[in-house]
Amino acid sequence: MVVTAMDARRPVVLLELNELTPSIMDRFIAEGRLPNFKRLRDRSEVFVTDAEERPPYLEPWIQWVTVHTGVPYSEHKVFRLSEGHKAPQKRIWDLVSQAGGAVWVCGSMNCRYDPGTRGWVLPDPWSTDAEPYPDALLPYFRFVQRNVQEYTNDRVPLTKADYLNFVRFMVGNGLSAGTAASIARQLIAEKKARGGRWRRAFILEELQLDLFSAVYRRLKPSFSTFFLNSTAHMQHRYWRYMEPELFKVPVSKEKQREYQSAILDGYRAMDKLVGRILKLIGDDVVVIMATALSQQSCLDYEETGGKRAYRPKEFSELINFAGITSPHRVSPVMAEQFWIHFENNADASAAQKRLEALQVGGQSAMRVKRDESGVFAACCLRHEISPDTVLQVVESDRSIPFFDLFYAMEGGKSGMHHPDGILWIRHPEREPAIHSEKVGLRSIAPTILETLGIEKPEYMKGSSLFPPATPSVPRERVEV
């Protein structure tokens, strides 16, 4: 590997703002609602990316692995969330660390990292097999992981001691007065209105930026990432409240009032964080903002009442009802999905059959896949279920009210994935420009490596967006 004076190169910060949508971004900027996004866009080269995948391979945990490795799904083969460690290719941060640069990976989805990494790595909160590095990050990682994995559940499995340990960690690792004030306002608002708990996602990301900022100042990394997901969640759950005219299923006036601004609130919350990041890193750092993919309205289920999702209230109760008795460990993932890890393949195979035997009205209730000694499962029912629905075990007299074991996730699902994504690159040595031709996600890793003076590995077939002989095409500069 050839390295050309990395220490003299400009650092690179990769902002990973999952699934933000180009058309919504442009609309909110035009309305004057996102001043910091506008400032970044006006100083960047602007691209639209193509994920170059279609369902079932159009998923963020697949696309982000492509961004980080520079190879498509057909080569990295990572299909599920929390399986990032299975991809053999090195990530961008592995190559930077190997070249002698410090790295700070803050929340990147489906990540893995080489032993002895020069820097800090905080995996995404859905990771079940990845641990943060160094161990000093464990109090933060475990607290956020439980909050995110149980975000839709009223009962988050955290003790007073867990909260106290987390507060101690944050006080020593960047907790800002602004974030503390946001927490206080959120708790007061929840108590007064007895609702609005969904806004806690924005608070968690303020905390994440506090931590990112503290480590960034301490480490001064050559390459860093910062991942955010709250707005992707808002788009999935609340698109119908943003554009109710597109949907056939009516919503109550009360819910319309509460959720009509949820997506806008998500973009505005991220806009504030982007402003803080730009202030933190200054004007001399290369900033790359990517979304990997985006979303669009999900209208496919309107004839059957809209797309629904159901999640176990307590995984142990569902597993006991299914008749699974082998030693196991449950790891919630995203939304309704979860892993059950067993001690051997035989136990996992037996558990798979028991979960597949659960039915509602003659229809399978669970989608189940086994991967060696692990079982990946989720409720596969997508229609509205009546309160008196019964969950049954096939070829037995065992049954239980469905809602004794499951709850309906708030908001249903009214946003779905789209292969287009946002890519803005602010390079102090290049002119702002708008590029009309779409680019593949595989070009992002080579672009970052070239910016840092690191030769890309042979397995990366994509080309840098900044080949030395190709200048950017300038556009009229907009002063802000």
What are these regions (language model features)?
Residues 28-32, 119-123, 240-244, 300-311:
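Short secondary-structure boundary/capping segments
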Residues 36, 265-304, 423, 448:
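Metal-dependent active-site segment of extracytoplasmic phospho-/sulfohydrolases and closely related
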